[in-house]
Amino acid sequence: APTPSLKLVAIAVAGSYLAVYWYHFLFHLGEKDPAAVNLVESMRGNDIEIGRLTHPKRMPLRLSWRDINHHIHILGQPGVGKSVLLKNIYAHQIMQGEGLLMLDLKADYKVREDFKSLCKMADREQDFVLIDLSHPESSYGYNPLLLGNATELKDKIIGAIEWSEPYYKKVSERTLLTVLRGLVYLRDQKGMVSNLEDLLVAISTVQGVTLLAEQVDEASIRADIQSLAAGFSKDFAKDLESLKTELTLLVKAEFGSIFKSDKTLDVFSAIMEKKVILVNLDGQTYNESAKKFGRLLLADLRSASGAIVTNIPEQERPRFAVLVDEFSDIVSTEDMAKTFVGFLNRCRGSGIGVVIAHQSLGDFKDPTVKAQIMDSTETMFSFVQKDPETCDILASVVGTKESYEKTKQTKEWIFGDDNTGMGTKKLVHEFIYHPNVFRNLNVGEAIYAAKKPSRFGTVHVKMIEIPHVPQEQTKVKAPCISDMKTLALNDELNKRRTEYTSAIRNSTTKIEDLEI
């Protein structure tokens, strides 16, 4: 039987547990959601805890601001952990009070709610800026002509378009530069801000060019615009057709009102004020138009980066992160990649760090583009890969290690081969991570490699839960086909063709009475 002293100890321990329980129950009512508290606590340090390394050492993996400032490249098939890794980065950036811009081609609802909840937890709701192509009525505005000189704006617009004919590209560049010199003059000297619709009007007709010339007071700029108007022939208008079409597709799109909104994003000011910007591009709905929108924003970042380096002392430059999901869809040609690589190489000095994510290196058709992107990013995470070429390249990127290859000499024996005790031992170099390792990674598991100093490992990415703020949902009624009339233009056209044919055969019917 237990002694009285043991009974007293047991009673004391039980009483302590009960006291602690009731203390928390009575005095911690109304506190924040435990998940929110845990998230806030985990984001207190300056470094981002991404997860835990399982090879070569078991230890936490943390990324510093230097890692982000020297750019991060994330690869992985859908559903294997890319979004979770990005979530760790943007959650830390928001909770630390730093600036952020994320281009989300998927326009994921969960990401939008993550940003709203994180800003609320960090008491930064006034810093949140949402540009949403799916909901232009509630979106922040964006004007590509707000920041930059005429040459910068020309390069921004030309770079957003995929060109197949160099001739039409050159004609468009020359025309844009002339017109934009006038628009920039009006913006900077008269405070008259133009938008893409104004630009489209100015390059579409002689009347538009002439109207612009009348507004400009500076003699040399006005003379150049008048010269453009004088040579505005039918052939010249045809040469500009591609440019006009591309601008029309943006201005007249369902999200075209974003370009004309009074509440407009100023990228330079947003960086300096550490704003939290989410751009929902909705590539599934708008596809090519969404990609052009994303390219315009990236070009604005390049202009803002240059303005920061030129005008802001180094100690006053904020830490601003740029996250680009489905990167390869936005930067899809060699010219675009060269421009973006130039931005990567220069934006470190302005305090901008870039994180790009996409599926595999096979997304880049041009090998030059592939090499440029790999060389310009210092840290790489690769989740499971199925493309053999990508696996081979990534294994080479991580590198090799020295090991000894041993061989044994055998001889035939009655009961099979037997060792003779002789053999060789040769020093060889083998992959640290064989290509097959990249093919067989589990969900949430990635190979990590970084330069300067050289680091590598296998990491299990940390899953974080962001408690969402309850919001009233607006249900959108889907149109019912049975309640609508079908236009059926083709059926109507065939019907009229039949009537016309019958009229030809019937001499009593007057053909002019029929509409074709």
Segments the model singles out, each with a brief description of its role:
Residues 27-36, 43, 53-57, 65-352, ...:
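P-loop NTPase motor domains
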Residues 2-14:
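Hydrophobic alpha-helical transmembrane segments
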Residues 105, 283, 384-387, 463:
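Short loop or secondary-structure boundary microenvironments that flank
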Residues 11-30:
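Transmembrane alpha-helices and immediately adjacent membrane-cytoplasm interface residues
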Residues 146, 151, 234, 341-447, ...:
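Conserved ATP-driven motor cores of ASCE-family P-loop NTPases powering translocation/secretion/packaging/pilus
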